[in-house]
Every structure is written in structure tokens, then in C-alpha cells.
Amino acid sequence: MNNARKILSALSFCFLASATLSVAAQSVGYTKLNVKGRVQLEIPSDWTISDAEQRKRVKELGEKLVGIPILHTASLAAQSYPAPSRTLVRVSFIPMEPPITQADVRQEVQANKQQVLRDLADSWREESTTMWAGLAKNGVKEVGRPSFAVEPIGGQTALIIVYGRTSTANPAETMRVTQYHVPLGAEKALITLSYIEGDQQAIAAHNRLKSSIVIR
């Protein structure tokens, strides 16, 4: 059974609109967040966390940009402070029918990892064409070529897509985006981490955030 295509069939694109809350700068500690009891992570305490209404607006903006419906609203969206943000994280949960478990994914990867990666790449090429066409109308371009992997994150196995795009704040800069698709049975967790390439502070924040993730 080809699970890679099913996992990516409701591909979720990361639209990084700059809708943020104004918050006062704090001394930088870290805040532990628990998203729906399934994904835990830590972000710097001076980051901005988008509220439900903002997340809904980002979803609607994404639909407007690419002209296709987005099947979910992010459960968590947070970004570095101050704006324009240099590091961002989004966590979403997307229903999967039929369910695909971690055991299913591990079994398929063990049987033929290269085929899983080929299927992942094929699905991305098919699904992302509309996204890039929509983003291009708004001045956002793809940078370089995407890469694909199957790796653990937070104690679970993820199908991973990495791509670059021009920054919405500064087209001369590249935003590096990594999508982690993590099947969890009846739903998948989609964790999207983004940072500005070449910004050492943004890269360090990204790496620390990634290492803090625990998925149940």
C-alpha cells in the first residue's frame, strides 16, 4: 500500500502572512507549549503567538493566494519577535482516512525507503504546482530545488519536505521551509518550521525549537 501519497494527498502549504499580535519585549526565557496534547515544543518567551482569529485569517489569505481550499486552520502559529519575523513555527492536525499509523509508515519505509521518497517527491511536484503559481502572482518565488527525507522528529517518524522561497518581507532573502508530516492514526500532525537562510540567530532559534519537539 502506497502510504506516502495518502499522507501527502491533503498537502498543506505554509502561508506565512505577517499577521501578528503586538507584544511587549520580555527577557528571553522559554515557554513550553502543548498543542492538543499531541505535540509539545518550546519557544522563546518573547515570540508572538497568533490567536485563533489570526490563524483563521492566515488560512483565508492562503486560499486567496493560490485559489484552492485549505482543509484546516493551524492549531498553533508562532513567530520570532520583532517583526518581520525571522523564524516561524506552525502546527496543524489534519484528518486521515483511512488512518495511517506510525507502524504502517515504518513498515513501508523498511520495505522500500527509496520508493517512499520517490512517491513523496512525485506527490509534492503534483500538489505544489498550483501553490507556486498562486504565490508567483504575489511576487513569491521558489528558490532552489526541494529535497525529501524520512527522519525521526520528536520520537516519531516523519515524511519531510524542504524547500526555499523568497521572503515576503525582503525578496532578496530566502526563507527555508521544512514540513514534517507525521501520521498518528486517524490524523497527521503537520509541523512547519521556517527561518531566513544565513541568519545565524534565526538558525539557532530554529535548531533549538526543533530539538524541543515531542510528539505523542
Language model: regions and residue ranges:
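Extracytoplasmic/secreted proteins, especially bacterial periplasmic and envelope-associated proteins
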Residues: R38, E42, T130, A204-R208
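Conserved polar/disulfide-associated segments of primarily extracytoplasmic proteins
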Residues: Q54-R176
